[in-house]
Swiss-Prot record:
<feature type="active site" description="Nucleophile">
    <location>
        <position position="377"/>
    </location>
</feature>
<comment type="similarity">
    <text>Belongs to the glycosyl hydrolase 13 family. GlgE subfamily.</text>
</comment>
<feature type="binding site">
    <location>
        <position position="378"/>
    </location>
    <ligand>
        <name>alpha-maltose 1-phosphate</name>
    </ligand>
</feature>
<dbReference type="GO" id="GO:0016757">
    <property type="term" value="F:glycosyltransferase activity"/>
</dbReference>
<dbReference type="InterPro" id="IPR013780">
    <property type="entry name" value="Glyco_hydro_b"/>
</dbReference>
<comment type="subunit">
    <text>Homodimer.</text>
</comment>
<feature type="region of interest" description="Disordered">
    <location>
        <begin position="244"/>
        <end position="270"/>
    </location>
</feature>
<feature type="binding site">
    <location>
        <position position="246"/>
    </location>
    <ligand>
        <name>alpha-maltose 1-phosphate</name>
    </ligand>
</feature>
<dbReference type="Pfam" id="PF11896">
    <property type="entry name" value="GlgE_dom_N_S"/>
</dbReference>
<dbReference type="InterPro" id="IPR013783">
    <property type="entry name" value="Ig-like_fold"/>
</dbReference>
<dbReference type="InterPro" id="IPR026585">
    <property type="entry name" value="GlgE"/>
</dbReference>
<keyword id="KW-0119">Carbohydrate metabolism</keyword>
<dbReference type="InterPro" id="IPR017853">
    <property type="entry name" value="Glycoside_hydrolase_SF"/>
</dbReference>
<feature type="binding site">
    <location>
        <position position="306"/>
    </location>
    <ligand>
        <name>alpha-maltose 1-phosphate</name>
    </ligand>
</feature>
<feature type="active site" description="Proton donor">
    <location>
        <position position="406"/>
    </location>
</feature>
<keyword id="KW-0328">Glycosyltransferase</keyword>
<keyword id="KW-0808">Transferase</keyword>
Length: 594
């Protein structure tokens, strides 16, 4: 397009991420507001349209835009398929509407409009793409028009609602401007709206002396579904290394029966594409996935790119790892912390491209086993280019695969992970406890540009994080954080033990004492004081109210008490609206005015 042709300006596109470098995220089947600033020099009227299509197809779907205010235009668009899409804009000078508005003003002022009516005839004659009905309508208007007729009647005929509609469909698009093509990815709904329940399969036997199996997990499925969850997330299920194995409470002196951390992946039994033999085999895993689906649950797996020192890859591909000057392999560190049972891979030098292919193939392997959701451990410590490539490779074949970024790191890093392809992200919700903190953070997530590429998943706790708030708040605090997590966000999650208000900490730390990361546990979820009914209620509200699905519909309201958070959610048509008042003080009742 020549510079002189770009007379109509198109800018400020809401679904344009970094100039089109990254795809904005939408949900397949959900209507989305597509907006842009569109304007022209002078006072001429303009018109605009959005064009969209599924990537790889030829035909565009056109949706006309509507003027909002201050040169802002909007179209309501639905991307039907879970797939990659493309989006662009057209804008042009609307000479017919300009003529109609100007002549109406002159007629109202009593001015002669004979020449203007002739100009109107010529505009009507200029229709280019009219169908048979529109062509017949225009011909009839022109045929009924005559210079001897009263000017007002002639203008009324030329500007009738039928004429306006026909000209909107088929009038020439003068000074047509086309915007660049932007990428869009339409996720399936579970990327934006899901309730996760996290467990360690090895602790599901009911006996702290017996390693759990997939069959034990199958017996727990009715319980998880009865609570109202739809995603069942497992920590790593692979063989656990024996070299430098950790003991209870992360000790360096394990006992002979200590199971080790499931994040120390790999042993002589296999690596990331193998199953811990005490859990079961691929046949029993397949039965588990099938049984979960029958209960309305999806299985999510932990994808942790790290290896135990006895992982087969270290022997088979030493070039994928870092080695110290004395010839020993370098274990993972985050000074002053050390992770003696874990070795990190190196993504460049001799590891490129074979390691990248191997990791992609691990994900595809589990996809073929029926897993379509992956929680990724510490993605912020791996290269952004790898994630962009790997997620793109997987979703080009399986667009229904969802990746959750377990990244508790700097804001810009978390947002970059969303841009490169992650459908969900852990968030700072875990540490936002006061009214001001929650309002500020949720306002950022729901109103700023990041809402188009970063979807938070509000986990109230994790195996690694025993929040200080929960350590000191008792049962009431667990109910508070449950209500906030389940109703503020579209995605939220609980790690098992939450329902019995488990909060015993390692003194002075946000960690669980006797964490099942390092030992088998047996849980009694029916013990006195449990909050199962609260969880069921929250998930029932989420399932039965359409307003709960889109977290960007969140709005905060006045409650004149710093311990009371007031907020609501509604559907676009306001047919479903929920108002929440949450007492953030777990120790005392509160009153408020609003």
């Amino acid at each position: 397009m020549r510079l002189a042709d770009a007379r109509v300006a198109i800018e400020g596109v809401n679904l344009e991420i970094d100039g089109g470098r990254f795809a904005a995220k939408v949900v397949a089947g959900w209507e989305v507001a597509v907006e842009a600033d569109i304007f022209c020099d002078g006072h001429d009227s303009i018109d605009a349209a959005v064009l969209h299509r599924q990537r790889g197809t030829d035909d565009w779907t056109e949706v006309r835009m509507e003027f909002l205010v201050n040169d802002r235009w909007q179209a309501r668009v639905t991307f039907a398929e879970n797939a990659f899409h493309e989006l662009t804009f057209l804008a042009w000078r609307d000479l017919y509407t300009t003529w109609r508005k100007e002549v109406a003003k002159k007629l109202a002022a009593g001015q002669k409009i004979d020449l203007e009516l002739e100009e109107g005839r010529r505009l009507l004659q200029s229709v280019e793409t009219a169908g048979a009905e529109d062509r017949a309508l225009v011909d009839r208007i022109l045929g009924e028009d005559g210079a001897d007729q009263e000017a007002g009647a002639r203008f009324a005929r030329m500007s009738s609602p039928e004429a306006v509609a026909a000209m909107k469909r088929c009038a020439p698009r003068t000074n047509l401007t086309c915007y660049k093509i932007l990428p869009i990815f339409a996720d399936r709904e579970a990327a934006a709206f899901s309730a996760w329940y996290e467990m360690m399969p090895r602790s599901q036997s009911g006996d702290p002396e017996r390693h759990g199996t997939f069959d034990d997990v199958i017996r727990k499925l009715p319980y998880v579904r009865d609570l109202g969850f739809d995603v069942l997330y497992f920590t790593p299920i692979h063989p656990i290394g024996r070299v430098n194995r950790k003991g209870r409470n992360n000790s360096l002196t394990p006992g002979p029966d200590d199971p080790g951390s499931p994040y120390a992946i790999g042993s002589e039994e296999g690596g990331h594409d193998a199953i811990h033999p005490e859990l079961g085999d691929f046949e029993s895993f397949g039965r588990l996935v099938e049984a979960a689906h029958a209960h309305g649950l999806e299985v999510a797996l932990d994808f942790a790119i790290q290896c135990a020192p006895d992982h087969p890859w270290i022997r088979e591909h030493p070039e994928w790892f870092d080695w110290r000057p004395d010839g020993t392999i370098k274990f993972a560190e985050n000074p002053p912390k050390k992770y003696e049972d874990i070795v990190n891979v190196h993504f460049y030098r001799g590891a490129l491209p074979e390691l990248w292919y191997a990791l992609r193939d691990v994900v595809l392997f589990w996809v073929e086993k029926g897993v379509k959701i992956f929680r990724v451990d510490n993605p912020h410590t791996k290269p952004f280019p790898f994630w962009e490539w790997m997620i793109g490779e997987v979703q080009s074949q399986h667009p229904d695969v969802i990746f959750l970024a377990e990244a508790f790191t700097r804001p810009k890093v978390m947002k970059r992970l969303g841009k490169v392809g992650y459908g969900q992200s852990y968030s700072y919700f875990t540490w936002r406890n006061t009214k001001a903190e929650l309002i500020d953070y949720l306002t950022e997530l729901t109103t700023e540009e990041c809402r188009h590429y970063m979807r938070p998943n509000f986990f109230a706790n994790t195996p690694d994080i025993n929040p200080v708030y929960l350590q000191h708040s008792g049962r009431a605090g667990f109910r508070v954080r449950l209500a906030l997590a389940a109703t503020l966000g579209g995605n939220y999650g609980l790690y098992n033990g939450y329902e019995i208000c488990e909060a015993t900490p390692v003194p002075g730390k946000e960690e669980y004492f006797n964490s099942e990361k390092y030992q088998l546990r047996a849980w009694d979820f029916d013990q006195p004081g449990h909050i199962q009914d609260d969880i069921r209620l929250m998930n029932h509200i989420r399932r039965t109210h359409p307003a709960m699905r889109d977290f960007t519909r969140l709005r905060f309201y006045d409650a004149h008490n710093d311990s009371v958070l007031a907020y609501g959610k509604s559907t676009e048509d306001k047919q479903d609206f929920l108002l929440f008042h949450v007492n953030l003080d777990p120790h005392a009742a509160q009153t408020f005015e609003f």
